[in-house]
């Protein structure tokens, strides 16, 4: 059987606090681990999407509206719905691992790095679909 949930794949969260949010898979664990005895993925997603920007807005207002609030989480495969999209995040692959979640300072540092990476991606204009909220 072909593995669908691979690193770099964009998925939607279907259950829980972040239901309906878009995430990108950073690392997948098919067999499970001691702390999570089921197939799961370490994901980074967008908790708060950037707001709409128009030409008439000033630079300061555009900068405020272009902020992205990320989250990192370990999610069961059953709660992820894969999409056809992929997102290239080479600098995040080794940064967020299952051990990152044990230490709060590591977690916040990882979130800051994810935030910077997401904002860079958003500023370039590529992967625009990832940074728009899902309408349903």
From Swiss-Prot:
Protein's UniProt keywords contain Ribonucleoprotein: yes
One Gene Ontology BP term is:
cytoplasmic translation
**Chief location:** cytoplasm
Q: Where in the cell is it found?
A: Cytoplasm
Note the InterPro entries from the entry: Ribosomal_eL27, Ribosomal_eL27_CS, Ribosomal_eL27_KOW, Ribosomal_eL27_sf, Translation_prot_SH3-like_sf
Provide one Gene Ontology cellular component.
cytosolic large ribosomal subunit
In terms of Pfam families, this protein maps to:
Ribosomal_L27e
Note in the entry: There are 2 genes for eL27 in S.pombe.
PANTHER family according to UniProt: 60S RIBOSOMAL PROTEIN L27 (PTHR10497)
Function, in words: Component of the ribosome, a large ribonucleoprotein complex responsible for the synthesis of proteins in the cell. The small ribosomal subunit (SSU) binds messenger RNAs (mRNAs) and translates the encoded message by selecting cognate aminoacyl-transfer RNA (tRNA) molecules. The large subunit (LSU) contains the ribosomal catalytic site termed the peptidyl transferase center (PTC), which catalyzes the formation of peptide bonds, thereby polymerizing the amino acids delivered by tRNAs into a polypeptide chain.
What quaternary arrangement does the UniProt entry report? Answer: Component of the large ribosomal subunit (LSU). Mature yeast ribosomes consist of a small (40S) and a large (60S) subunit. The 40S small subunit contains 1 molecule of ribosomal RNA (18S rRNA) and at least 33 different proteins. The large 60S subunit contains 3 rRNA molecules (25S, 5.8S and 5S rRNA) and at least 46 different proteins.
Q: What is this protein called?
A: Large ribosomal subunit protein eL27B
**Provenance organism:** Schizosaccharomyces pombe (strain 972 / ATCC 24843) (Fission yeast)
């Amino acid at each position: 059987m072909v593995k669908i949930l691979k690193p770099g794949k964009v998925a939607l969260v279907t259950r829980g606090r972040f239901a309906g949010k878009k995430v990108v898979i950073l690392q997948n664990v098919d067999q499970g681990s001691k702390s999570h005895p089921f197939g799961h993925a370490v994901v980074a997603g967008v908790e708060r999407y950037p707001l709409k920007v128009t030409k008439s807005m000033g630079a300061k207002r555009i900068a405020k509206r272009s902020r992205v609030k990320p989250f990192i989480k370990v999610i069961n495969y059953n709660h992820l719905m894969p999409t056809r999209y992929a997102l290239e995040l080479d600098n995040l692959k080794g940064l967020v691992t299952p051990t990152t979640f044990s230490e709060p300072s590591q977690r916040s540092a990882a979130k800051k790095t994810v935030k910077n990476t997401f904002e860079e991606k958003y500023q370039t204009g590529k992967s625009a679909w990832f940074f728009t909220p899902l309408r349903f």
